[in-house]
Amino acid sequence: MSMDMTTRMFKEEGWIRKKCPKCGKYFWTLDPDRETCGDPPCDEYQFIGKPGIPKKYTLDEMREKFLSFFEKHESYPHGRVKRYPVLPRWRDDVLLVGASIMDFQPWVISGEADPPANPLTISQPSIRFTDIDNVGITGRHFTIFEMMAHHAFNYPGKPIYWMDETVELAFEFFTKELKMKPEDITFKENPWAGGGNAGPAFEVLYRGLEVATLVFMQYKKAPADADPSQVVEIKGDYYVPMETRVVDTGYGLERLVWMSHGTPTAYDAVLGYVIEPLKKMAGVEKIDERILMENSRLAGMFDIEDMGDLRYLREQVAKRVGISVEELEKAVRPYELIYAIADHTKALTFMLADGVIPSNVKAGYLARLLIRKSIRHLRELGLEIPLAEIVAMHIKELSPTFPEFKEMEDVILDIINVEEKRYAETLRRGSDLVKREIAKLKKKGINELPLEKLILFYESHGLTPEIVAEVAEKEGIKVNIPDNFYTLVAKEAEKQAEKKEAAEYVVDFELVKDLPDTRTLYYEDPFMKEFDARVLKVIADWVVLDQTAFYPEGGGQPYDTGVLEVNGEKVKVTNVQKVGKVILHKVEKPELFKEGVTVHGRLDWDRRIQHMRHHTGTHVLMGALVRVLGKHVWQAGSQLHTDWARLDISHYKRITEEELREIERLANRVVMENRKVTWEWLPRTEAEMKYGFRLYQGGVVPGRVIRVLKIEDWDVQACGGTHLPNTGLIGPIKILRTERIQDGVERIIFAAGEAAINWMQETERLLKRTAEIFRVPPEKVPETAERFFNEWKEARKEVEKLRKELAKLLVYELQEKVEKVGNVEFIGAVVEGTIDDLREAANRLRKENRVVVLISREGHFVVAVGDGLDLKAGELAKVITSVAGGGGGGRKELAQGRIKNPLKAEEAIEEVKKMLG
């Protein structure tokens, strides 16, 4: 892409455009003597030990300095916007927020929703795993950082500001507010592309550090049929102009604070409250600061993901400071581990506070990665402290700015403790898993563990590569751990989130795209049972009406059924679906329907009202779950039926009986209070600002305007389902059971209204019947059942004892029947007893040079072969079944089965003897 990026400021204030001889990129500078662009690796850090900002700032001070500057700017006042959660509930194509612009994708960028302010300023906590293997080493990389930004959305005919103003605002902030030296600032031209958008951009560099990026987003991915004259190429992809042009900036909060301190690493400047206690706990020796400074200067020019070799960095640093690589490693490794722990635990604090539940999928997988990587680092440092202790340090430090951390503290720390215990259990089981895999590799003559197996051990079993290597190398198998291992696994997880399946419709969208939107009578009056409508189109066995009271399947609520009356004949409606904004009804006799004909619809009301009870009941139950279990609870799915409903929630451990009783009690209290249930259509941004992102409990809701359902002082969600006007109409809510359907997800099965009454009546009937059988009153059933169970257990013990005695007698009797067949001792007999009796006796009789064949009168058989014989019990079992039918199998030394014809048992034993002889 070629574009003139000469701004007003560059032209009027004497800036010079130069080409960097090292990277070949163009940049702007006020310094006529400057040769290079200022970006590593073209330039080293020039602020380590010599801060580039006169005043030392804390994170809070720098953030406020930035936001206030833009909020109160005389010419361009910006609306200050609160941070968004790092878990992006408003979109389903990414796992975590990695930049401030992601807060406004896709809805604001596409024009489907208005921005909360325009222009706006924000400081957005952002999490990126693409740099995880650099964290702790380079001094500048974080998994969690705050991207301070100012954004302007230039809609057609409504310009705000563009390149000239953006560059001037950045320069003004840096030089007038932070007192940076103008001649040391460079603006490097480097086009940007990401998330399907692109545009020209400046990287703002100061003394070797990129402190901001100014992107002018004006292109979107080109469709296949794009006008060639409109297409531009940026970084190998093709784009066309967007209607909305967006100023997308990002200023690194941590980097600017680091610049003001000039410490060897950014971690020292912003995470000291964790780093210093960890250094004391680990007994880390203070080292020559020159080593850390030189390490940082060179590491700033290094990226593990690009170079893939940490050893190269070590060699270069060691050479510069005049020590061996081993001495350098010993000196800096503890610092790198502590830096990484401090960063990872801060990221975890944000993730868990915003509702991420550690698991094996999606964002939960990335949270678990951070937990286990941090634990591993602690162990390498020789520290046995709980990880929760470090997370608590972050909560204490950050809560004044992020009060939600204090509110969520108990849950956050409990999650960490639960995960640490799970990891310990994983490690106990892990060694055997690795050994089994190694045995398979050895059989194939492979002496190195493939990378895909290393990743599989981590993803499926949570075994870090270091643990796998430790076990494998003891077994003589080499393990090569890539320096960017964690980056690889994180990228794979993020790729899975980007995969979106295309919508599948019951009929081709092209067949209905020209039809008017179907009028949704079920929203206008959810209690409408009958209606008249006109047929607009018939497509196979689907009928399109101009309006309908039939609810189409969606949002976990099943479709309505009923009848459509046409020309005096009642036709069953068996399915209702929505394609775009057109509703289709599947009918049994489509040939009766003609375009323009008026029909009369009648719903199966019993089905609909029960769906409504369960749907409103789901919202009531969700409110109770959040209040009892915590704000981390999030809806992970739901499905309604007439007899029962299910609600899946994110939760990190099993729900206890006590918690279930409290949840059920709260839900039924809300029902009895007969709270109002109301709904309204609101512009998306207004709804988000009014109610927050808990709106999206049921998932991402498309559209500029969304339907918001409110249960008075209890629950608010964006929801497209049909609901009751008050909670009293739900009737009783009864939780039937809970299930753990996957890691981090609990399923609650419940019934409401008539379905709950039916369940309670059936339970009562069964209780009464059980009481009759025991001949006790219903209230005595539990203790009576327990008594019977204990008596049964005692009787079972006695039976087992007698069985063993019988087996001893059987063994004693059979030992008298040993005969010599060829070179083998042989015992063969038809006996009384169960398969367990036979197995017990055969195992007792089995000796090194002996074969035992026992067949019961019911047809069960057991074959035992001594260890000293070159025979397989399974082969002898085949001889038995070849004579008497049936089947069986087993290990080399023991096989069992059942024959079809017990009358041929003796004959089968003789056949085995023949084979041995």
From Swiss-Prot:
GO cellular component assignments? cytoplasm
Q: Name one molecular function that GO assigns to this entry.
A: aminoacyl-tRNA deacylase activity
Domain of life here? Answer: Archaea
What does the record give as the reaction this protein catalyses? tRNA(Ala) + L-alanine + ATP = L-alanyl-tRNA(Ala) + AMP + diphosphate
**Per its Swiss-Prot or TrEMBL entry, what cofactor is needed?**
Zn(2+)
Keyword field contains Lyase: no
Q: Where does it localize?
A: Cytoplasm
SMART domains the record matches: tRNA_SAD (SM00863)
- Keywords noted in UniProt: Aminoacyl-tRNA synthetase, ATP-binding, Cytoplasm, Ligase, Metal-binding, Nucleotide-binding, Protein biosynthesis, RNA-binding, tRNA-binding, Zinc
Q: How is the cofactor bound?
A: Binds 1 zinc ion per subunit.
Q: Which residues bind Zn(2+)?
A: H615, H619, C719, H723
Biological process GO annotation list? alanyl-tRNA aminoacylation
Q: What is known of its domains?
A: Consists of three domains; the N-terminal catalytic domain, the editing domain and the C-terminal C-Ala domain. The editing domain removes incorrectly charged amino acids, while the C-Ala domain, along with tRNA(Ala), serves as a bridge to cooperatively bring together the editing and aminoacylation centers thus stimulating deacylation of misacylated tRNAs.
Family in the record? Belongs to the class-II aminoacyl-tRNA synthetase family.
PANTHER family in the record: ALANINE--TRNA LIGASE, CYTOPLASMIC, ALANYL-TRNA SYNTHETASE
Q: What does this protein do?
A: Catalyzes the attachment of alanine to tRNA(Ala) in a two-step reaction: alanine is first activated by ATP to form Ala-AMP and then transferred to the acceptor end of tRNA(Ala). Also edits incorrectly charged Ser-tRNA(Ala) and Gly-tRNA(Ala) via its editing domain.
Protein name stated in the entry: Alanine--tRNA ligase
